Each structure stands twice: as C-alpha cells, then as structure tokens.
C-alpha cells in the first residue's frame, strides 16, 4: 500500500486530556480508556417518512449541530438543529418531517472551536466527494433478484484462487470491448471481446477459472475529484474518507447517492452468478488526512495513536495510524466489516497494513464474521510501514499469525525467494538463477508451516514457521505494489530474451499454484501485462496501469498455460491440503544435486487425490537438470512450458530430465 500525499504529522491542539469549562456538557477525561462506549449499533441516522433520528458519538463535545442541506455539495444549510447529549457520549435529535433526498452533516464544538462539517464516521450514503451524508430510500438500491443472491460455495480456504484487480486497470483500455469502462458495471457485462474475438471482462475471469476477485479499495476515498471525472485521474484508493460507502468515481453518476450503491450491488450480483466471490481491500489502518478527517472532527485524538510527545504515530507511513485497540475504533471496524457483508454481500476482506492493528481486534472481527459465514475470508499484509505505537507482540504481524486462527497473511518469503528483494529490483533470486533462495521457496511451498525438510535458518525473512495451518499463507509473486512479474524479471535479468521471460513467467506462477496455502494472482499477469517498469503506479495514468487486452491474443500461449495450471490445481486436492499434519505426511522434498533446482513429491493419494504420486520440479537453470525420482511409470502433464492433463508422454525413472527455466509435473 502506497499513496503519495503529504500529511500533517502533528495532532495540533488536541490532547488526551479534554477539559471544557463554562459548558453544561463539561467533560473531563484523563485518558482515552475512560471515554464512554456507545452501546448498540453505531448507526448515525434512522429514516422514516414521518421523522428522521440522528445520533453522533462525541463524548468530548460541548455542543453538536445537525446541518441539513438540499444538495450534496455547495450552498448553505437550510436548517440547523441543535443536538442533545444523551447516554454514553452520544448526541441525538429528531427531525419530524420527511427528509428523503436531503443531505446532512454534523458540526462539533470542542474547546470553544467548531471542528467543521463532517458526514459522521458511519455514513452509508453520501453526495459527490463524500462531504455530506445522504438520506435515501434503500429499497431502490437493490437490483432485481438481490434478495436471492447467494455467495458461491467454498469448502476450504485452500480452494481459493485470488485475482487482484483495480476497476480502471481491468476495463478502461479501448481494447477491452467493455462499455462501462472503469466502472462497477464493467464487471456486469457479458459477451465482451478484444479485437481477436477473445473474451474480456467477467467472461475472461470465468474462462481463467479464478474463484475470488480482490478489488482494490472501493470505499469512498479522497484522491479522485468526483466532479472532474472527465479528466481521467487515477489512484489506487488507499486514502480512505467514508469507510462504508462505495466510491463514486467508479459509478456512472457520483452526484446521485443511490447510483453508486446499486451499481456496486449489481457488480457483486453478476460476479456471484458467474461463480466468483468478491473480496474488498479495506484500509482501516489510517485516514487520508488527520485534522480534517471524519474521525478527528468527531472525537479529536481518540481514533489515532499518539507518541509520548503528543505527535501522531505513523505506523502506516501515511501520516497517522488508527488505534484499533480502543473500544470505539474496534467497534467501528467490526460493524463496518459486518455492514459490507450484510448490505453488499461481500465475501472476504484484505486488510491493508494489517500489522498496524492489534491481534485482539482482528480476532474479534474473525469471530463476528464466523457467526455470519465462516467461509468469508480474511487476510492481510502482516507488516506495517513503520513501527506502530503499540506493543509488537500484540500486533497482527506475520510473526504473530499463529495467534489469529482463520486469518491469513502474504508470504514475502516466497515472493522474494523467487524474485529477489522487493526493494532492490535489480537483484534477482531463484528465477534469475541466483542461488540461495531455494529454502525460502520451499518455505512457501509447504505453506509457511513447520516441516521437517524446511530449515528456517536458511529462509530469507523468517527464522521459524509462522503459520499453524497452510491456509494462513497467501502465496504470490506480484501484486499492485512493486513491479509486476515481467517487469521484475526484466529488471533483475536485463539480458533475458523474450522467450526466457515467457518461460520464467510460467515457472513463477507454477510455483505459486502448486504450493500449499492460498494462491494469489495480480490481474493481467495471465496475459503478461507490464507497467513500463514503474514499481509504484498508484497515480500513474491509464497508459501505464490499464490492461491491454490485445495481449490476450499475442500472449495466448501464456493465458492458456495459466488457465490449465489453475484447472490442474482445482482438479487435484493434493495441491490444496488445508491441514498442516496432512502436508507434513504427504509432501516430501526430493534430493537434488546443485542449486536452482527444487523438487517435491505429493505421495500416497494426498488429500484423497486420484493420482497416487505426483512429482513436481522447478528448474531455474538455463540448462536441463537431472533429477532422481522413485521408480514407477509416470504420466507427464507439465513440461517445457506446456500443460496437458491428457498427457505429454511418460517417464519410468529412476531419473528424469527437467528442461531449463521451466517446471515439470508428472503423476502415477
């Protein structure tokens, strides 16, 4: 996660102690732990045609005003209503008239200073650019058949194959054949093709065979001005404003609050009908700015961690870090996740910089989600950008994942064992034929669990296994952050030929998709996308980020390989053992001579597989390698950059040749 804005690093006049004199609502707290906690839901608006009730938790406020507007932007409030302080620091009021179609904001007075308009921390509908909350008829936001929408079945997290995408990347290019380019609705269009008459869009996803689409941040964010969408500005969206509203820039009309809501639901519904689950990228670890954030304008200081000198902690690297351990921030995060599940039928969550959050909060989120549906996935980045202002042993870091059952993290060990150090793009590793990364790759192959043949003292980043179960590890070689795969190969192997790049691209993803754990693919890798060598394209133009769908034709061989590789994994449970003991019993590394060669055996019909024994070998040398195998008659299904489950010939052992810069898979 990266964004490039400059942020205020000082909290300003707000301190932990808040004293308000000469006020009928004077409150004095010596620590954030003493702030009252609102009971029940954090709902801030309840509408009926006869009256609308408003609520705002702001325990340190001297006064709170409700501002009513006719429009989502511009103009002045047509009515101002003074709110009354109720229980547990919650201010309330009721407006006894029909407010449908109106907009509202709150303004909080603290230490004799009005903080400025905020839609609250929990708005569910907003006007353009999210400055004001909207009062809408929610029944009009449900597409036809929404009540019968169901998430596709999923037996185990090991069965997941995640496809990470950005809305604009996936559909905005002129070659996509998609009408609603860069919009939620792009993922509802069937029958779209490129110039070679090959499927694009949602049909492409079905053809590829992925099970989950991971959407980069899709809740309301700051960096795109929704009033200037014709200027085609781009951003990943890791600068959150309103956490519980879809972003308007991906809708066909950001001025109408119901449009973004309905179109987001249409997208989810279409993906579900196509057999694909939907994962949201959520960014609870920081806000776009601090002093003007909805959190800060509502309860100054409370939602952020501070250093001892009162300045903002910055574990996110973006100017602030949220305080997930505080009761109301924890409550907010739990309710937010549950809201996206209930209202939008979301099937999973990827937590940006999850290492900023505390373990207890993440476990409470997992427990709350389990009560709805335990197959809803939760995974995240098991690290932070800088050291958070919280005890390290209580943070949701990768090394602590054993204390978070049912939550997964990305394996940078496998990624960098294959590609090289992510921050040193010219340095290669296993794929580049650089020796020394083999044990890190093996660590990823077993799913980051304890395995008798994996020596963690030779693993790049972890001196001990951190996963209790292989399904706590996400395996990948590329994502939106850093270089995409082909750019990484070019940077670390400047002399590589186009043919070698293709071979190594296939080899890399074969490691990912035959490893235990949860495989993850960056959108466009299946057609060998590039981003012109840019490793932080968070605000680069479409010319850099968009998938050129002509590549599906020119790189058809690569797409076919990915498709067949995915099908191979889905068809054979040996590659999807969700249990650590099963992995230790059935996965055995074979002895090899020299470096840059890794081989393993999935034996004894692992996980009930129809294949009795499976041999998998990865050779990153430029020359063929000899591999000793158990004697038997094997059918080759992957060799020299080609996959065909019908067979590519047979081998009998006790020795087999593994072609250079490629994978070999065979079974008996």
Functional labels for PLM-detected ranges:
Residues 168-344, 357-373, 377, 388-389:
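Substrate-binding/active-site clefts of carbohydrate-active enzymes
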Residues 48-62, 588-628:
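Carbohydrate-binding surface patches
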Residues 553-582:
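Catalytic cores of secreted or luminal carbohydrate-active enzymes
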Residues 19-21:
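C-terminal motif of bacterial Sec signal peptides marking the signal peptidase cleavage site
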Residues 56, 106, 165, 215, ...:
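Conserved, mostly hydrophobic/aromatic
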Residues 25-49, 85-189:
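The feature marks proteins involved in alpha-glucan
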Residues 129-136, 366-367, 371, 375-528, ...:
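Conserved alpha/beta catalytic core and glycan-binding cleft of carbohydrate-active enzymes
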Residues 58, 101-104, 648-668:
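C-terminal beta-strand-rich structural cap/linker in extracellular carbohydrate-active enzymes
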């Amino acid at each position: 996660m990266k964004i490039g804005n400059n942020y205020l690093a000082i909290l300003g006049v707000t301190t932990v102690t808040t004293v308000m004199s000469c006020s009928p609502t004077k409150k004095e707290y010596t620590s954030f732990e003493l702030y009252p906690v609102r009971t029940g839901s954090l709902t801030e608006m309840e509408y009926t045609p006869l009256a609308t009730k408003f609520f705002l938790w702001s325990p340190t406020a001297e006064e709170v005003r409700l501002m009513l507007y006719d429009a989502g932007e511009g103009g002045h409030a047509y009515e101002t209503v003074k709110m009354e302080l109720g229980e547990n620091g919650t201010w309330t009021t009721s407006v006894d008239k029909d407010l449908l179609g109106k907009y509202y904001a709150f303004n909080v007075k603290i230490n004799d200073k009005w903080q400025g308009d905020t839609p609250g921390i929990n708005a569910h509908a907003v006007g353009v650019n999210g400055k004001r909350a909207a009062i809408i008829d929610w029944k009009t936001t449900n597409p036809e058949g929404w009540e019968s929408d169901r998430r596709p079945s999923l037996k185990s997290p090991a069965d997941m194959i995640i496809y990470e995408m950005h809305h604009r990347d996936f559909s905005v290019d002129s070659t996509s054949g998609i009408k609603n380019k860069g919009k939620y609705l792009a993922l509802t269009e069937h029958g779209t093709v490129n110039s070679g008459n090959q499927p694009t869009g949602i049909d492409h996803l079905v053809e590829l065979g992925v099970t989950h689409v991971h959407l980069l941040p899709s809740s309301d964010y700051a960096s795109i001005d929704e009033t200037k969408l014709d200027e085609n500005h781009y951003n990943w969206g890791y600068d959150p404003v309103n956490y519980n509203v879809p972003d308007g820039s991906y809708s066909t009309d950001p001025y109408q609050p119901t449009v973004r809501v309905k179109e987001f639901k249409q997208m989810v519904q279409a993906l579900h009908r196509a057999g694909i689950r939907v994962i949201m990228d959520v960014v609870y670890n920081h806000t776009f700015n601090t002093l003007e954030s909805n959190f800060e304008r509502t309860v100054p200081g409370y939602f952020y961690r501070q250093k001892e000198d009162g300045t903002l902690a910055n574990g996110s690297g973006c100017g602030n870090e949220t305080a997930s351990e505080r009761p109301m921030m924890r409550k907010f995060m739990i309710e937010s996740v549950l809201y996206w599940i209930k209202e939008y039928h979301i099937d999973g969550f990827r937590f940006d910089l999850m290492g900023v959050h505390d373990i207890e909060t993440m476990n409470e989120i997992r427990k709350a989600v389990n009560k709805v549906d335990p197959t809803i996935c939760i995974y995240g980045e098991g690290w932070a950008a800088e050291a958070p202002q919280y005890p390290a042993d209580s943070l949701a870091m990768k090394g602590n994942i054993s204390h978070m059952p049912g939550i997964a993290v990305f394996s940078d060990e496998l990624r960098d064992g294959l590609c090289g150090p992510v921050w040193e793009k010219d340095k290669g590793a296993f794929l580049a034929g650089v020796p020394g990364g083999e044990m890190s790759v093996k660590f990823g192959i077993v799913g980051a669990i304890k395995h008798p043949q994996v020596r963690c003292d030779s693993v790049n980043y972890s001196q001990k296994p951190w996963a209790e179960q292989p399904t706590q590890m996400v395996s990948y070689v590329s994502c939106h952050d850093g270089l995409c795969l082909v750019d990484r190969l070019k940077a670390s192997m400047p002399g590589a030929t186009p043919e070698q790049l293709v071979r190594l691209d296939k080899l890399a993803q074969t490691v990912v998709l035959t490893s235990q754990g949860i495989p993850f693919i960056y959108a466009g890798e299946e057609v060998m996308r590039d981003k012109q060598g840019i490793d932080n394209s968070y605000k680069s133009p479409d010319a850099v980020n968009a998938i050129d769908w002509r590549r599906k034709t020119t790189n058809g061989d690569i797409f076919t390989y990915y498709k067949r590789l995915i099908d191979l994994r889905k068809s054979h449970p040996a590659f999807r053992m969700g249990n650590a003991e099963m992995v230790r019993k059935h996965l055995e590394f074979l002895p090899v001579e020299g470096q840059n060669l890794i081989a393993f055996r999935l034996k004894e019909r692992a996980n009930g597989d129809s294949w009795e024994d499976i041999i998998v070998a990865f050779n990153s040398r430029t020359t063929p390698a000899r591999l000793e195998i158990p004697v038997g008659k094997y059918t080759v299904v992957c060799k020299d950059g080609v996959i065909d489950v019908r067979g590519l010939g047979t081998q009998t052992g006790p020795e087999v040749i593994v072609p250079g810069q490629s994978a070999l898979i065979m079974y008996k």
